[in-house]
Amino acid sequence: MVDHSNTRVVVGMSGGVDSSVTALLLKQQGYDVIGVFMKNWDDTDENGVCTATEDYEDVAKVASKIGIPYYSVNFEKEYWDRVFEYFLDEYKHGRTPNPDVMCNKEVKFKAFLDYAMELDADFIAMGHYAQIERDENGIAHMLRGGDSNKDQTYFLSALSQDQLQKSMFPIGHMQKSEVRRLAEEAGLATAKKKDSTGICFIGERNFKQFLGEYLPAQPGKMMTVDGLEKGTHDGLMYYTIGQRSGLGIGGGGESNDPWFVVGKDLEQNILYVGQGYHNELLYADQLDASKMTWITPVDHGTDFHCTAKFRYRQQDVGITVHMTSETTATVVFDAPVRAITPGQAVVFYDGAECLGGGTIDVAYKVATDDADKQVLQYV
């Protein structure tokens, strides 16, 4: 048996079952384990309850149970500067950002990693459902989690090789049910705690009300691309491509099909809507992406075929990547895809391996007759 006692691992403990079992497994494997709770947001909820206090109490219970030291570190400034300001700026520009991708890149695997190094850590560990495999050259490859329903590689796609080299995902190969079983068998206080949902560190508060506290809403016209007015919207930032709820439009026209958001015009403050789930305006053939990063230093070439996800839990789609610079690309789909959303992450896969990703700037159709782009989303 390998002696890990001289290898220090600092575990990011959230007060949830996944990070609790992560710390438990590492302790059982003989590592020198330290638990650290990150406070990244002043998260007093709508009822005046500070959930961070409750979560830290759970961390304390778990750490005491398994016999490891634990600390709390405050990254509220780092989160605000590196994640939240980006989040607001994207919404201000009519896009729908994915703060979880940025939070992992800038806070959990950057600010936290830096802090762990100050504690003389050899590695950090997180309770993510993803796997790391190193090849014969020592290059770290990120693979999908063993539980396909919990796989989190989509949110980890912006991590660098350096970040991955210093990271461990001890539960990455496991099923969620197995994680809960281990927690129960060990008598951990978090064994039956429900999973957190909502935006990274903002939680489950009323999103529209929350966003309105930071950005002034600008109501405007809601209309079809043919110019037919359908009412007013509350502010473009509250809507995303493909959204059905909250439009306040009944059936009408030649059918009673529901209405969906099909585009935004930021300059004129117009929200475009279309009728029918399969409305052709919701489908795109390709997209342009920026901020492209790759996890491994492998040269994929300027044109290559793989699969991609455009949102979490989506089925993989066959695509061809055409690199237009080191950090930008045009992504062409094997078949049209519905409701591509600017601001979200496009994440690339080769089988089980997550290759990296980028940010969706715009999606469009290319007309077959003159190859003109029909830009659908106007942002």
UniProtKB/Swiss-Prot annotation:
Subcellular location: Cytoplasm
Site-annotated residues for Interaction with tRNA: 128, 344
Catalytic activities: S-sulfanyl-L-cysteinyl-[protein] + uridine(34) in tRNA + AH2 + ATP = 2-thiouridine(34) in tRNA + L-cysteinyl-[protein] + A + AMP + diphosphate + H(+)
Region Interaction with target base in tRNA, annotated ranges: 98-100
Disulfide partners: 103-200
GO molecular function terms listed in the Swiss-Prot or TrEMBL record: ATP binding; tRNA binding; tRNA-uridine 2-sulfurtransferase activity
Matching HAMAP family: tRNA_thiouridyl_MnmA (MF_00144)
Name by which UniProt lists this protein: tRNA-specific 2-thiouridylase MnmA
Gene of this entry: mnmA
